[in-house]
């Protein structure tokens, strides 16, 4: 897979995820945690907005770089940097269960994030 295409795929998906977090943070919180106490609080929604903004930023950086860089070492560097960011996000989400903050790990990020990481690694290393 070409690096530019991988950056655009990962960029588009992460922008959509970030938008979902920002458009309906309360709904997303309820999807993840159920109807628990505080799920619709302003603080929890504000946290979701900030997390979504970070994910959107990562996606927009990938899209921007895919449009402004030529295929080569620079695009590989962007993809490996994206892997580092996504892996950090993945570990942070998973650690919530192991640290006792949640009773289960949300399924969607445990599927989407490794898939995006695999796309980046496959393209950068290929």
Regions found by a protein language model. Name each.
Residues 1-14, 39-43:
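Cytosolic juxtamembrane helix and N-cap/initiation of the first transmembrane helix
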Residues 4, 75-78, 101-110:
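Non-cytosolic membrane-interface motifs at loop->transmembrane helix junctions
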Residues 9-31:
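N-terminal signal-anchor/start-transfer transmembrane helix
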Residues 16, 42-67, 83-88:
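Core segments of alpha-helical transmembrane spans in multipass integral membrane proteins
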Residues 25-44:
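Cytosolic, membrane-interface loops and tails of multi-pass inner-membrane proteins
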Residues 56-59, 117-126:
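Hydrophobic alpha-helical transmembrane segments in multi-pass integral membrane proteins
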Residues 78-93, 112-120:
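Hydrophobic alpha-helical membrane segments
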Residues 90-108, 124-126:
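Membrane-helix boundary connector in multi-pass membrane proteins
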């Amino acid at each position: 897979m070409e690096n530019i295409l991988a950056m655009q795929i990962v960029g588009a998906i992460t922008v959509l995820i970030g938008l979902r977090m920002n458009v309906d943070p309360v709904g997303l919180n309820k999807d993840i945690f159920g109807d628990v106490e505080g799920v619709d609080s302003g603080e929890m929604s504000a946290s979701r907005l900030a997390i979504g903004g970070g994910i959107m930023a990562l996606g927009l950086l990938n899209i921007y770089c895919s449009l402004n860089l030529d295929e080569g070492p620079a695009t590989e560097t962007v993809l490996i940097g994206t892997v580092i960011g996504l892996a950090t996000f993945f570990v942070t989400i998973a650690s919530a269960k192991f640290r006792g903050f949640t009773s289960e790990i949300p399924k969607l990020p445990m599927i989407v994030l490794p898939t995006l990481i695999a796309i980046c690694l496959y393209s950068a290393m290929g």
